[in-house]
Amino acid sequence: MSERNTAIVLAAGQGKRMHSKVQKQFLEIQGYPVLYYSLRCFQESPLIQDIILVTGEESISYCKEEIVQKYGFTKVSAVIPGGKERYDSVWMGLKAVKDDLPKEATEGIVFIHDGARPMVSEDILERCFQDAQKYNACVAAVPVKDTIKIADENGFAETTPRRDRVWQVQ
């Protein structure tokens, strides 16, 4: 049996809530696009053998030339178009993983990561990897600090969930 762990990095979002002309995954932080930091973490991780980058159709060439090639992300095996919604892009990434697997790869874990979240680390990958092996699934999350309200169909607050029971998925 051969294990092959793949990271699907989602970078097809339009960032409409930001009202920016530049998609947030391409905004620069300290001279590098936000997407660079996520790809670098997966590139440098010994846990990951393959990266599938899912982006908008209009950004494929940019991602290939200005990010993957420019920064030497050799583990990126495919840059593919995403779908209309996030779940469509995840599905496209999963299909690409299946299509890209060598015959000898019979096991492995698929990491799905939002490319606009640059703070992923080797520690997070290792903990998710261990939990995925143990429980067959894992999601990185942080405890919520804000007060959250559950509203009725008219928008009126009905209940307040306990903060210690609410997590923000990363």
Language model features: what each stretch is:
Residues 16, 115-119:
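Acidic metal-phosphate-binding loop of nucleotide-sugar-dependent transferases
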Residues 61-67:
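Acidic helix N-cap motif at the loop->helix transition within catalytic regions
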